[in-house]
Amino acid sequence: MKKSSIFLRLLALCLWPMFGYSQSKSGDAIVAGDGVAVTSTDNGQVRGYIHNGTFNYKGIPYATAKRFMAPEKPAAWQGIRQSLVYGAVCPIDPTTTVNDPIEFAFQHNWGYMSEDCLKLNVWTPGINDQKKRPVMVWLHGGGFSAGSAIELPSYDGENLSKKGDVVVVSINHRLNLLGFLNLSAYGDKYKSSANVGMMDIVSALQWVKQNIANFGGDPDNVTIFGQSGGGGKVTTLMAAPSAKGLFQKAIVQSGSYQTKFMDNEVSKKIGAAMLEVLNLQPSQVDSLQTISYERLSAAAKKALPKVAAQLKAEGKPIAGFGLGWEPVNDGVFLPYQLNDAAALELSKNVPLLVGSTKTEFMASLINPAIRNYSLDDVKTALKKRYGDKTDTYMAEVLKAYPNTVKPSDYMDIDLATFRPGVIRQANAKAVAGAAPVYMYQFAWASPVNDGMYKSVHCIDICFEFNNIARCEEMTGGGKEAYALAGKMSQAWVNFAGTGNPNAKGLPNWPAYTADNGAAMIFDNQPVVKYHNDAALLKLAAENK
């Protein structure tokens, strides 16, 4: 062999890592090091790592922002930025509701907090390979006040990326008072303050639009999906003009609880109350830039109840979860109310997948004594709400859910928190008619801890992300859980790819209409039912 030929081969071997390994070739579980998984963004090159064949990038800056101000593009960097570990999470208040059974199942990761939190994470099967994979952008739960992209093990995008040959993105953004304190009355510099938390998400979607092709994704085939508060964020983006065109499909999981955005004047009252609690004059508003988050949070705990009491005195009760931090109908970022015709028009061509779990915030997890109730105990408790219709209610439960076994099941079914909102949101989407809406309900019950978790809020995420192995404490990690996760994650991937969730192993899943009431019931044997719980919902609405 000629020396020149040998030299060229050696040169190729040396240069190959510099181009970022378009696909993983190593048999090692982890491949990391100089030249591994290198790709480009608008702001500079990033280096991730390869885990079990999937490219991981963590903590990539997508924006930067001063407190209470609109996000801006981050500064460019020289060289290759390491993107190997998660970035900071937005500051939130300490959690007070965690106990041993809940923490055992959920396995929270609180991360480290910093206002420098506008970072995102990417999982992809390949980079720089000219492929156009569907992109799935995950928005975490926690309302608009808490949570993060790393809070739960189920949020890890690697298995979903590998399962469906898709690119998965998750983001952190500003929350609570940092994301939604309306100071617009105090100067032009704060004109966007009421919704900067949502503006962060739009900035992340703009980053995806501009950069995801370098991560093997299709910038014109983006699905936003989120659970609980993340579902609320999805719903909000569907009504935000600045987000139009940045996503093509939407999934709302246990997040259909909003009926309207916060009124702008109410939001301004909260801003005024914050200044008053902190003994600041309007001319001193800039002092809020340097006050610690902890002190601001303490002030908010006084300001919010104060405004809520004022609204109550004015005959303006607060619906839903009470007065808190949420998107504001500010006339700029959100110029329309949630269900205005103009808001619905913005996303009329976006297919929607929407649903919730069977038991969500179940009574027996809040009050453990209910787990030991006899059938007579349950009837006594239900009579406080349903009176002489209690027997009718229990009969309707058995019709809708024939696998009802435990007496506590009658008290744990979600008929108020999310399920009515799912139907309300699906009906509004179906009426628009331009793009389909598909409905589901997650009814699978966890066997862990004597079955105490049932179909608890958040459990479905483990299945949609194909993350049973990461969520064994919540799911048990049994064969049935793995089988259902395979079907559900494929349905989510198919929806992201085509706007249709039908998948192998599932019965035919028709689009929802108000007339057919079609919903996929996810259990060990998934089945499509029609107006499955209509009678139950009617009873619940009539007996609040």
PLM regions and their residue ranges:
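Short glycine-enriched nucleophile-adjacent loop
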Residues: 231-243
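Alpha/beta-hydrolase fold nucleophile elbow
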Residues: 215-227
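Substrate-access "cap/lid" subdomains that shape
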Residues: 210, 244, 253-375, 410-428, ...
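Alpha/beta-hydrolase active-site loop
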Residues: 117, 191-213
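Bacterial Sec-dependent N-terminal signal peptides
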Residues: 1-31
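Mobile gating loops/cap/lid regions near enzyme active sites that modulate substrate access
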Residues: 60, 419-544
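Non-catalytic accessory segments of hydrolases
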Residues: 24-195, 219, 361, 475-488, ...
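Active-site loop->helix "elbow" adjoining a glycine-rich segment at hydrolase catalytic centers
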Residues: 141, 196-200, 228-231
